[in-house]
Amino acid sequence: MWSLKSTLCIALLVTYSVAQDSTTVDTTAATTATGGTTATGGTTATGGTTVSGATTAASGATTASTCADDPNTDCTQYTSLCSNAKYTPLLQQFCPKTCGFCGGGSTAAPVQCVDSSTNCANWEKNGFCSSTFYDCANKKQYCAKTCKLCTTTC
């Protein structure tokens, strides 16, 4: 069985080697085959290896009632890739719980809303949060919690 780390390394190597041959390969929908299943039906790269256009369901596919991360994968190190469409098929297979791909909503740890400055309480008293002098992004950067901007897109 392939690990997520091995799969990502292979995907990057294929992308690199194909780029060196000046051939474009879309690896967005490619997943590593497991249990002897071969990914087929996509663009063929040098050497006749098909690397895109197919996804392979793992045996015992993840469902809402059995949603769990692969026990052999440290999914916490891949959380930054959860929203990257290029890695979605792999992360759905190996890290569905960590990345929030389980049915019934996200099971990923919620992002904590905090102030990065210790002066926010004083700044709020002085009108920082309601001031038009500072843009939303600055207010959110320093005092997201105090200014109640945690769920606001600036």
Curated annotation (Swiss-Prot):
Endpoints of the signal sequence: 1-19
Gene3D superfamilies: 1.10.10.1940
Cystine bridges: C67-C102, C75-C95, C82-C99, C113-C150, C120-C143, C129-C147
Segments crossing the lipid bilayer: none
Domain annotation ShKT: ranges: 67-102, 113-150
GO BP term, pick one: innate immune response
InterPro entries per the UniProt record, alphabetical: ShKT_dom
SMART domains documented for this protein: ShKT
Keywords recorded for this protein, A-Z: Disulfide bond, Repeat, Signal
PANTHER family given in the database record: SHKT DOMAIN-CONTAINING PROTEIN
Protein name, as recorded: Uncharacterized protein ZK673.1
